[in-house]
Regions:
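Glycine-rich, histidine-containing beta strand-loop boundary motifs that form or position
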Residues: 80-82, 108, 176, 314
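Short, surface-exposed loop or secondary-structure junction motifs
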Residues: 29, 35, 40, 94-301
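Conserved hydrophobic/aromatic "anchor" residues
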Residues: 32, 53, 85, 172, ...
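Short active-site loop at a secondary-structure junction
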Residues: 4, 11-23, 42-104, 143-155, ...
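Secondary-structure transition/hinge residues
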Residues: 13, 71, 75, 90, ...
């Protein structure tokens, strides 16, 4: 059975997402971990927890540990000047000689920020990235005196990476392997130049694989389970990094010249947040956090001493998650008892369907769209109601869903009816029914009801209404089958919850619905330059329609696309553009 954390995550991601993975470690053991989606949208191979994600700037913690190891061994000191260790590092601005190793780690170096060229690449071929960085810096100036204020800076960690490689006299990727990943058995954790085929790297959609020559600032790729193994170093004594160095990393080193600025001072050494307190989640004191973002990925690592826990999550951007808050919500769900009411299900309202997923104290509201279910609201439970961040509330009275917005409570939806369909109704599903009897002056079919189709979603039947996609009025009507020829709306929610009742029925091969007559696409003949007749005519466009018939007074042409949505209407003033397929209605 799928765990509740994964159920919640699946309800939150966008329908066309590629991949997402998370892991929780407590007391040194993985207690909950999963991966959803596919490795890429080319081969659609299902993802596993062994697959790796680019965790980007979380790499800065690895780089900082490498530096602190040098400090622990007495090979360097944090206040050493970078230019003394790397004489090849020069800048136009002579103040660069004041930059210390520590300033590279707490973002106060004053360096420009990011050497963007080849920051992210699509090849694992190794090239001299250090030379590119040094050349870029040699033609740059500082944004401030070193140590004046902290502002996010990738360049500092590239220099720190160079320091590690220089002092160890070996490639940075080899340092990581020898001094960190091999010691914690994190086999999936690598850089661009040491990626292992047993731990496939995820790609967003059909985009290229993303690799990072900028290793110290953003080049780590890892599974979430192995990321947790690394995070565990900060919760227990170990031989990899000393307690003294961990304490220094967790200290607030960030600096600012603005009295009320609380952001810059949250920088530790490598850590993005060393005074992490969230108003919605009581994770206690001493929480450390670091995020990472690239062109295709977002990731988060959180250390929670209160629960002796390490939390890790990474997504491809098409998941659409707020990664920091999502990770905290997922872990909170893992911790919570199963004592909350469950109102999960499909709910029907006057304009369509919503899916409610309640998992412990979290509620996810999803709207039905052409692409699938898309999250539209996220709420938390308290005292019989769910409340979102705006203060709007949802609660239930029997099978009815009520909403409170700006102190006004209204009935909004009711539990959707599920119904088995016979072969007659199954044969009608997902076919387009094109309006036949509109008039040259009817604006309604310019906006909606120019075509309809029957759709079944999770055993719930509805009538999809197609119209002007740029100005949609209504999308679908939940209905139930009465007999082989009749269906009807079943909503009886007060206020606006059941405002427009429809009763589609079939007679003599035609569909009658909402005062209009519709013809099934199966019964529509192809368009071959036919002209207007005395009665309305509907045709199917099978070949590119370059030119429309001439329109005289009190006549009208509607062109629908293959999906049944309005593409062109002579009632509007817009110019017609050729379409490859669809329907044409001569009115």
């Amino acid at each position: 059975m799928e765990n509740q954390v994964t159920q919640l995550l699946k309800a939150m991601v966008k329908p066309d997402y590629t991949a997402c993975s998370y892991a929780f470690m407590q007391d040194g053991k993985i207690v909950c971990a999963d991966a959803i989606g596919v490795i890429d949208k080319i081969n659609n191979q299902p993802i596993t927890t062994d697959c790796t994600f680019n965790v980007c700037s979380i790499s800065k913690i690895y780089c900082t540990v490498c530096i602190m190891q040098l400090v622990d061994e007495g090979l360097i000191q944090l206040e050493d000047k970078v230019s003394d260790i790397l004489p090849e590092f020069t800048m136009k601005d002579k103040r660069y000689k004041d930059i210390t190793v520590r300033m590279c780690l707490d973002h106060s170096s004053g360096l420009p920020g990011t050497q963007w060229k080849h920051f992210s690449v699509s090849t694992i071929s190794k090239f001299d990235y250090y030379s590119e960085v040094l050349n870029y810096l040699s033609n740059s100036t500082l944004k401030a005196d070193p140590g004046t204020y902290s502002t996010y800076c990738n360049d500092g960690f590239t220099l720190a990476e160079m320091v590690v490689s220089k002092v160890r006299n070996m490639p940075y990727e080899d340092v990581l392997k020898k001094y960190i990943t091999e010691k914690i058995s994190a086999k999936s954790t690598n850089t661009t130049y040491t990626i292992h085929s047993d731990y496939p790297l995820v790609s967003e959609g059909k985009k290229p694989k993303e690799y990072f020559p900028i290793q110290g600032a953003g080049g780590i790729t890892t599974s979430m389970i192995d990321l947790c193994k690394f995070g565990q170093l900060f919760l227990e004594p170990n031989s990899i990094i000393s307690e003294k160095s961990k304490a220094l990393m967790a200290k607030s080193w960030g600096t600012t010249f603005l009295e009320l600025d609380l952001g810059a001072i949250d920088f530790g050494l490598g850590w993005g947040l060393v005074r992490h307190h969230d108003p919605d989640y009581d994770f206690g004191d001493g929480v450390l956090a670091k995020g990472g973002n690239s062109m295709f990925f977002s990731s988060r690592l959180i250390i929670v001493p209160k629960y002796n826990a390490v939390l890790a999550l990474s997504e491809t951007h098409d998941c659409g998650l707020d990664v920091p808050t999502t990770l905290m919500r997922l872990f909170n769900t893992y911790l919570e008892p199963n004592t909350y009411p469950d109102y999960s299900g499909i709910y029907a309202h006057a304009f369509g369907l919503q899916k409610i997923t309640t998992i412990k104290s979290s509620m996810v509201v999803q709207d039905k769209t052409e692409k699938g279910w898309i999250m539209s609201d996220l709420l938390n439970y308290s005292n019989g109601k769910w409340t979102n961040e705006k203060g709007n509330q949802i609660f239930f009275e029997g099978d009815y869903l009520l909403k409170t917005t700006r102190n006004r409570t209204v009935a909004f939806a009711q539990k959707a009816k599920k119904q088995e369909l016979n072969s007659v109704w199954k044969s009608r599903l997902n076919k387009k029914y094109i309006v036949y009897d509109t008039t040259f002056y009817d604006i309604v079919t310019n906006q909606m009801l120019c075509s309809v189709e029957f759709n079944r979603t999770e055993d719930t039947l509805s009538l999809i209404v197609h119209g002007n996609k740029s100005e949609p009025v209504v999308s679908e009507f939940p209905i139930e089958v009465i007999d082989d020829t009749h269906a009807q709306s079943y909503l009886n929610t007060p206020c606006n919850g059941s405002r427009d009742r429809i009763e589609p029925y079939f007679e003599d091969g035609k569909l009658y619905c909402a005062s209009y007559t519709y013809i099934c696409e199966d019964d529509i003949e192809p368009y071959n330059s036919q002209l207007f007749e005395k009665e309305n005519q509907v045709y199917k466009i099978n070949n590119t329609l370059e030119v429309l018939p001439t329109i005289c007074e009190n006549h009208r042409i509607l062109v629908l696309d293959a999906n049944g949505d309005l593409y062109y209407d002579s009632m509007d003033v817009e110019e017609y553009k050729p379409i490859e397929s669809g329907f044409i209605i001569l009115v």
